[in-house]
């Protein structure tokens, strides 16, 4: 049932996934549903809702990530990082969260799905020092743009990007950006079967 739902949703996008990738996404939803009962990882309880509100909502970002190394800050149960790692197997994602239960779940998902391109890390973002040069910092429902820039500025250099997944276009947040950061691009995202606005906001160091 989940497989059929995913196939139907994908048909409404330009995203092409292999059968293996689709199976990995379905298995991820199954694992999230199972672990959620004990660990309370997401307020979305039904797997059919997760497929739209979590999987597709994250997946539509994949075509807009040209780099090879990203960090997903405040990843929670792996959103968008796990989904993007499945869709982009040649891109590496550090999945950062401060809560041990979330990181334990991510380690289980990594092992269960054979995701060699993810590195779950338990740490506060302010204390984390990347071991490789990162192309971008990803955040979804993590913080305001100003907080994201303040907390994550040490993770990238001038060639890196701040990439925020937002709902309604955050015009007020953009007006209060700190000096040294510039707004580069906004991308309106279409999420199948989701009746809500979604925007990708891309910032860089000035």
UniProtKB/Swiss-Prot annotation:
Q: Which UniProt keywords apply?
A: Cytoplasm, Methyltransferase, rRNA processing, S-adenosyl-L-methionine, Transferase
Q: Which reaction does it catalyse?
A: guanosine(527) in 16S rRNA + S-adenosyl-L-methionine = N(7)-methylguanosine(527) in 16S rRNA + S-adenosyl-L-homocysteine
Q: What is its main location?
A: cytoplasm
In terms of InterPro entries, this protein maps to:
rRNA_ssu_MeTfrase_G (IPR003682), SAM-dependent_MTases_sf (IPR029063)
Cleaved signal peptide residues: none
State its location(s): Cytoplasm
* Source domain of life: Bacteria
- What's the stated role of this polypeptide? Specifically methylates the N7 position of guanine in position 527 of 16S rRNA.
Q: Which HAMAP family match?
A: 16SrRNA_methyltr_G (MF_00074)
Name the family the entry cites: Belongs to the methyltransferase superfamily. RNA methyltransferase RsmG family.
Task: Name it.
Answer: Ribosomal RNA small subunit methyltransferase G
- Species source reads Pseudoalteromonas translucida (strain TAC 125)
């Amino acid at each position: 049932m989940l497989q059929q739902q995913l196939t139907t949703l994908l048909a409404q996008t330009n995203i092409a996934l292999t059968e293996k990738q689709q199976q990995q996404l379905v298995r991820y939803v199954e694992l999230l549903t199972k672990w959620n009962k004990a660990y309370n990882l997401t307020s979305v309880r039904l797997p059919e809702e997760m497929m739209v509100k979590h999987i597709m909502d994250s997946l539509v970002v994949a075509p807009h990530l040209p780099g090879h190394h990203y960090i997903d800050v405040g990843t929670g149960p792996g959103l968008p990082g796990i989904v993007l790692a499945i869709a982009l197997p040649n891109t590496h994602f550090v999945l950062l969260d401060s809560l041990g239960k979330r990181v334990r779940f991510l380690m289980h998902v990594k092992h269960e799905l054979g995701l060699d391109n993810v590195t779950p890390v338990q740490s506060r973002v302010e204390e984390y020092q990347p071991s490789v040069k990162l192309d971008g910092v990803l955040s979804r429902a993590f913080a305001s743009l100003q907080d994201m820039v303040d907390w994550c500025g040490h993770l990238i250099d001038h060639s890196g990007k701040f990439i925020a997944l937002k709902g309604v276009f955050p015009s007020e947040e953009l007006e209060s950006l700190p000096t040294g950061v510039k707004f580069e691009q906004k991308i309106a995202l279409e999420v199948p079967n989701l009746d809500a606005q979604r925007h990708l906001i891309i910032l860089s160091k000035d």
